[in-house]
Amino acid sequence: MFKNYIEITKPGIIIGNSTLITGGFLFASRHAAFNYVLFIYTILGASLVIASACVFNNLIDIDIDKKMKRTSNRVLSKKLLPVFSVFNFAIFLGVLGLSILGCLVNFISMSLAVFGFFIYVVLYTMFYKRRSFYSTFIGSFSGSTPSVIGYTAVSNTIDICSILLFVIVIFWQMSHFYSISIMRIKDYREAKIPVFSVVKGVAITKKHIFFYVLNFSFFSSLFTFLGYLSYNFLLLSSIVNFYWSFLSYSNIKKNNDKKNARKLFYFSIIVIVFFNFLISIDVFF
């Protein structure tokens, strides 16, 4: 049973978001001493809130998950846990996480966690996901908050740098999840989820992926031109971003949609990990 409770928190998503939190935290720490205790509180608090949001997502999407091959074996789809207990578990995780952020980190980081939670659970999961192809865009605002939570945990302020970081991760989210929408288009059609690739078609989706990759690359470079990061960051990130742009542009003209979307999906993970690595270590260049 313990394993089932862990599974509904979606550990993979928590780990992925921890990368964003860590990148934002280290980025903001570039001109200050690294606070290990604050870092632990930030990771723990934010991860608990993310886990809570994921559990609520599982609860709300039970009917959808049963229809999709990829999710039909999830814990709640197979009724391995009582819904009431899962609901209480989600509340417990959320309250504990927000308490840690509010009491041991700062009010801004806690507020951002509330913002991200609301966007993901209420706007995305409960409303837009079932009704509009804009759901991915709405959800990307939630997916971008971990970076800023990490940043503001140190800075205790929302500045131009944190806003730029937020925007950059939105562009990454869009390209990343549009690739998923092509990979899993059959599942989304069967579950009647109006993702962009289903509503507008794969051809247009591939063009949009390229558009978002270009924007990610451009806005990333602004960190250097605005004086936040070094030219070493610009050089190294540009190499990776150029190849990502090449892949996404080539994908427009290729026919094997799922294969190429999968390639873009995996490379986008490399991109965001490398990006966070670079902003974390740039102070040493």
Swiss-Prot record:
- Report one GO cellular component: plasma membrane
- Isomerase: is it a keyword of this entry? no
Name the Enzyme Commission number(s) assigned to this protein: 2.5.1.141
Membrane topology, as annotated, equals: Multi-pass membrane protein
Tell me the enzyme class: transferase
**Where is the major localization of this protein?**
membrane
UniProt KW keywords: Cell membrane, Heme biosynthesis, Membrane, Transferase, Transmembrane, Transmembrane helix
Q: Where are the transmembrane segments?
A: 8-28, 36-56, 80-100, 107-127, 133-153, 163-183, 209-229, 232-252, 265-285
List cystine links.
none
Query: Which pathway does UniProt place it in?
Result: Porphyrin-containing compound metabolism; heme O biosynthesis; heme O from protoheme: step 1/1
Q: Where found in the cell? A: Cell membrane
Source taxon at top rank: Bacteria
What are the BP-aspect GO terms?
heme O biosynthetic process
| UniProt cross-references to InterPro entries, sorted A to Z | Protohaem_IX_farnesylTrfase, UbiA_prenyltransferase, UbiA_prenylTrfase_CS, UbiA_sf
Write out the catalysed reaction.
heme b + (2E,6E)-farnesyl diphosphate + H2O = Fe(II)-heme o + diphosphate
**What molecular function terms (GO) are annotated for this protein?**
protoheme IX farnesyltransferase activity
The record's Pfam families line, in alphabetical order, gives: UbiA (PF01040)
- HAMAP family attached to this UniProt entry: CyoE_CtaB
Its job: Converts heme B (protoheme IX) to heme O by substitution of the vinyl group on carbon 2 of heme B porphyrin ring with a hydroxyethyl farnesyl side group.
Name the family the entry cites. Belongs to the UbiA prenyltransferase family. Protoheme IX farnesyltransferase subfamily.
General remark: Carbon 2 of the heme B porphyrin ring is defined according to the Fischer nomenclature.
Task: Indicate what this protein is called per its UniProt record.
Answer: Protoheme IX farnesyltransferase
What is the native source organism of this protein?
Buchnera aphidicola subsp. Acyrthosiphon pisum (strain APS)
